[in-house]
Regions:
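Membrane-proximal cytosolic tails and large cytosolic loops of membrane proteins
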Residues: 1-36, 78-83, 626-655
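Short intracellular "coupling" helices and adjacent cytoplasmic loop segments at the cytosolic face
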Residues: 15-24, 41-43, 129, 137-167, ...
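Transmembrane helix-loop-helix hairpins at lipid-water interfaces of multipass membrane proteins
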Residues: 30, 46-116, 196-205, 300, ...
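An intracellular "coupling" helix at the cytosolic face of ABC transporter transmembrane type-1 domains
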Residues: 39-44, 148-152, 165-174, 178, ...
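Transmembrane helices of ABC transporter permease
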Residues: 52-59, 179-230, 304-315, 319
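Hydrophobic alpha-helical segments in the permease module
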Residues: 102, 106-113, 117, 210-215, ...
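Cytosolic ends of transmembrane helices, especially the final helix of ABC transmembrane type-1 domains
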Residues: 258, 282, 330-359
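ABC-type nucleotide-binding domain
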Residues: 366-367, 373-655
Length: 655
């Protein structure tokens, strides 16, 4: 795939910020922002295509305006047989006035016009779609450059709709502007010149006034409709977001029997969309009716003037037909003009929203002169780190600790202590508010984000997979890995045997977010792709907390293999998984209050020991419940677990 320089994206982002700042002003800001993509400096072939398309457009309009003359000549020739007024003998009109010749000329002109238009549109499509591709790619890349905070605060469904509509808006505005708007203006000018020279100033003035009034009414009515379309788009985005959110949480909806509740939420959004859509269609009817009245009045006026001139002996019958043909030819571009204005206005709205995204500056960005991270051993050090998501609520309060190269350090603590925040800071999803984080002595703010994240592998608590094959999801850790390397990673993650039982093996589709796989299977895929990545630093962010005890033990064995000889940070919920850690850090309210090995912390009798004892008591209670349920099941069902009398206890035992 062809790549485009990030500097272009930067220029577009700068233009986008200028557009957002001056949104109430000139909408030509959008055109200025988009023009470099229609007239690309690095593509002389596309520039030549634009120029040639405009030349073809000019020839097509000249042929279009010439077509009514063939009507005039044919009509005058036919009228001669009826004794009507005809052009004087010897004139060009007389010589070309034979009905057959005039009709053939009309046919040739129409064929030429059609061919010129189609060739022009076919050629310009390459320019338009190249602009769409570049802008869509730059916007997509910019979205990935934006901070985690931006994505957490935005609705994914709404964001994808913004990208989709922005892409379509760019396509529409380039096509409508250069292939419809500009040719229509040229045709208007040519028709006025013909009326002024072939007839007189009255006809030109009448048509000019009609065009001006038609466009004024169209602009005012369309501005009114735009407000309605905005409301309709917002309702559509809201309904679409609710639908995506509900379907992504399909199982949760089923757990709580909330189908009717979800349908009600969706229907309320669709009701708002319905009202806005009805208003949109009503306003469109008003617009079309007004346009028809304005054009019909002007057409009738010109025909009356031509009829009076014929009666006065100043015009021929062919002139009457020519005026009618010119006016009717104007109706098509005029009607398109209304549609063009509506589309351009709507496209501007859609592009504005895309520009809003482009105007967002990344919260975390590479500093000028940032160098790649040079990993020698992978030691990590946090020095008096202060961090907050909200300035009024500090999460980490002067946190300091070290993870020696090749060692495993676990971070534990109650909910809200700041455990997962540490992993996000290490990956530099956020910058610290105070202190610094170093890897092998290098401040992570001074190195490139790409090199930093390339050195770190993550196995998260909630693994989300791409809606693709198992092979694709494992190979995501290293796209250039061979099939054998992928299989070896799967064997180390203890998922190769499971994959072998699937009918499609490694090319099995995992479904949306990997929902076709169980939690344990998804975790093994995540472990396999981390093994394939082979990073010197590993973060296990509560990687087994969402799994049952049996699956947890199996996954833990795979994790132990991955962590061997790597600098490893374990964010732990279940303390039984980190008893062998080289050092355990105990956080509470963003502060390090204890550290040491498992034995040292237990002997100290502090918060860690309290958390450990609490978890052990909970585990023993679950074991007692499970055993009681098993005995009850054997008594009632002959060894078959049937605990229908106490489903709550059964669920608690399995949780």
């Amino acid at each position: 795939m062809q790549r485009f320089a990030p500097s272009r994206d930067g220029r577009l982002a700068s233009r986008a910020r200028a557009l957002v700042v001056g949104r109430g002003g000139d909408r030509l800001r959008v055109a200025r922002a988009l023009w470099p993509y229609v007239w690309p400096a690095d593509r002389p072939d596309l520039k030549a295509t634009v120029v040639f398309s405009l030349v073809l457009m000019l020839f097509a309009k000249l042929v279009t305006v010439a077509m009514p003359f063939t009507y005039k000549w044919a009509t005058d020739a036919l009228a001669a047989a009826a004794g009507a007024r005809v052009p004087p003998a010897g004139t060009l009109a007389f010589l070309l006035g034979a009905p057959v010749v005039a009709t053939l000329l009309y046919g040739l002109a129409r064929v030429a016009m059609s061919l010129l238009v189609q060739v022009r549109e076919g050629m310009f499509a390459k320019v338009a779609m190249h602009a769409v591709r570049r802008l869509a790619l730059n916007t997509f890349e910019h979205m990935h450059r934006l901070s985690l905070r931006f994505h957490l605060e935005r609705k994914t469904g709404g964001l994808t709709r913004v990208l989709e509509r922005g892409r379509l808006g760019i396509e529409n505005i380039t096509r409508m502007t250069l292939m419809t708007f500009v040719p229509t203006i040229v045709e208007f000018a040519l028709v006025l010149v013909v009326l002024l020279l072939a007839f007189d100033w009255r006809y030109a003035l009448a048509v000019a006034l009609m065009i001006a009034l038609y466009l004024w009414f169209t602009v005012r009515a369309t501005d009114w409709r735009i407000q309605i379309r905005r409301a309709m788009n917002e309702s559509d985005s809201d309904a679409n977001t609710k639908a995506i959110d509900s379907l992504l949480n399909y199982e949760t909806v089923k757990y709580f029997g909330a189908e009717e509740r979800e349908a009600g939420r969706y229907d309320r959004s669709m009701a708002a969309y319905e009202r806005a859509s009805v208003n949109s269609y009503t306003s469109l009817a008003v617009l079309n009716a007004g346009q028809a009245v304005i054009f019909t009045v002007a057409l009738t006026g010109c025909m009356v003037m031509a009829g009076l001139d014929i009666v006065a002996g100043q015009r021929t019958l062919g002139d009457f037909v020519m005026v009618n043909a010119l006016m009717l030819q104007l109706f098509i571009p005029l009607n398109f003009m209304g549609m063009v204005y509506r589309e351009i206005k709507q496209s501007l709205i859609d592009i504005e929203r895309m520009m809003d995204v482009m105007a967002q500056q990344p919260e975390v960005a590479d500093r000028p002169g940032a160098k790649p991270l040079a990993v020698s051993g992978g030691s990590i050090r946090l020095e008096k780190v202060v961090f907050h998501y909200d300035p009024e609520r500090t999460i980490l309060k002067g946190l300091s600790f070290e993870v020696p190269a090749g060692k495993m350090v676990a971070i534990v603590g109650p909910s809200g202590a700041g455990k997962s925040t540490v992993s996000r800071i290490l990956l530099r999803f956020y910058d610290v508010a105070g202190g610094r984080v170093t890897i092998d002595g290098q401040d992570i703010r001074e190195v490139t984000q790409a090199s930093l994240r390339a050195a770190i592998g993550v196995v998260p608590q909630d693994t989300v997979l791409f809606n693709d094959t198992i092979l694709y999801n494992i190979r995501y850790g290293r796209p250039d890995a061979s099939d054998e390397e992928v299989r070896e990673a799967a064997r180390m993650a203890q998922i190769d045997d499971f994959i072998a039982t699937l009918p499609d093996g490694y090319v099995t589709m995992v479904g949306e977010r990997g929902l076709k796989l169980s939690g344990g299977e998804k975790q093994r895929v995540a472990i396999a792709r981390t093994i394939l990545k082979a990073p010197p630093i590993l973060i296990l962010d509560e990687a087994t907390s969402a799994l049952d005890s049996h699956t947890e033990k199996e996954i833990q064995n795979a994790l132990d293999q991955v962590a061997r000889n790597r600098t490893t940070v374990v964010i732990a919920h279940r303390l039984s998984t980190i008893v062998n850690a080289d050092n355990i850090l105990v956080l509470d309210a963003g502060t390090l209050i204890e550290q040491g090995t498992h034995a040292e912390l237990m002997a100290r009798g502090g918060l860690y020991a309290s958390l450990w004892n609490r978890q052990r008591e909970a585990e023993r209670a679950r074991e007692v419940l499970a055993e009681a349920l098993a005995q009850e099941g054997r008594r009632i069902g002959g060894g078959r677990l049937q605990s229908t009398a106490s489903p709550a206890l059964e669920q608690e035992a399995h949780s």
